[in-house]
């Protein structure tokens, strides 16, 4: 269907997707929260602040995923790769909304730097797509692998009674690994050690800032 759109139409659709990624409460999810109970866990003030910081990091990660996928789809050379990027971005919208919902429940908010995170990620995704589809897909695979690592770390850090956040992050982790496999199956190549290390360094800076702001 996207093939029938004019350049202007694609630009409008892309701009709309970008706005939805950075404006709170502008997306709807086709799937409910992946939780077994609607009851909110009882948390102390300190626990609530820590959980909010972790969920803000995860929300920021989903914003970055949107930027990355949108940027790669914008410059990808192969139509199948573009479709794969868009499909993954669509699934990540659910993750974005789930994190946003949990932040609301905690009386907190997304990172104030959300537009910056999105813009930087879009640029990285676009550059990766320009280099080659194989590099772009490898970039996705490595990103998802690193996201899975920090999701598992966050699950371990959550208070024992906060099964709500744990279930959300556990489902996200399953799907992040599926996106990694999809990227590899579409031809993604392993990245060099310097690129992987640089990605991890940038991700750590983002996490440190997003936890507080």
From Swiss-Prot:
Pathway: Cofactor biosynthesis; ubiquinone biosynthesis. The lineage of its organism: Bacteria, Pseudomonadati, Pseudomonadota, Gammaproteobacteria, Moraxellales. One of its GO terms (biological process) is ubiquinone biosynthetic process. Binds 2 iron ions per subunit. It catalyses: a 5-methoxy-2-methyl-3-(all-trans-polyprenyl)benzene-1,4-diol + AH2 + O2 = a 3-demethylubiquinol + A + H2O. Pfam families: COQ7. Its EC number is 1.14.99.60. Belongs to the COQ7 family. Catalyzes the hydroxylation of 2-nonaprenyl-3-methyl-6-methoxy-1,4-benzoquinol during ubiquinone biosynthesis. Signal peptide: none annotated. It is a peripheral membrane protein. The keyword Endoplasmic reticulum does not apply. GO terms for molecular function: 3-demethoxyubiquinol 3-hydroxylase activity; metal ion binding. This is 3-demethoxyubiquinol 3-hydroxylase. Fe cation 1 binds at residues 62, 92, 95, 176. Keywords: Cell membrane, Iron, Membrane, Metal-binding, Monooxygenase, Oxidoreductase, Ubiquinone biosynthesis. SUPFAM superfamilies: Ferritin-like.
């Amino acid at each position: 269907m996207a093939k029938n759109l004019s350049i202007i139409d694609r630009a409008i659709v892309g701009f709309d997707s970008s706005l939805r990624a950075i404006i709170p409460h502008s997306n709807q999810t086709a799937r409910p929260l992946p939780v077994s109970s609607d009851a909110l866990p009882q948390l102390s003030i300190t626990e609530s602040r820590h959980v909010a910081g972790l969920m803000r990091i995860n929300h920021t990660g989903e914003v970055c995923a949107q930027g990355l996928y949108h940027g790669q789809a914008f410059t990808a050379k192969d139509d199948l790769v573009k479709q794969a990027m868009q499909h993954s971005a669509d699934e990540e919208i659910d993750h974005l909304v789930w994190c946003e919902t949990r932040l609301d429940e905690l009386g907190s908010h997304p990172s104030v730097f959300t537009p910056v995170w999105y813009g930087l990620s879009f640029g990285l995704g676009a550059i990766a797509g320009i280099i080659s589809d194989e590099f772009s897909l490898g970039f996705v695979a490595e990103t998802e692998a690193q996201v899975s690592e920090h999701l598992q770390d966050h699950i371990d850090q959550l208070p024992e009674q906060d099964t709500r956040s744990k279930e959300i992050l556990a489902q996200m982790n399953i799907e992040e690994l599926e996106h990694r496999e999809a990227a590899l199956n579409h031809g993604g190549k392993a990245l060099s050690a310097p690129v992987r290390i640089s990605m991890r360094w940038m991700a750590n800076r983002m996490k440190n800032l997003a936890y507080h702001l």
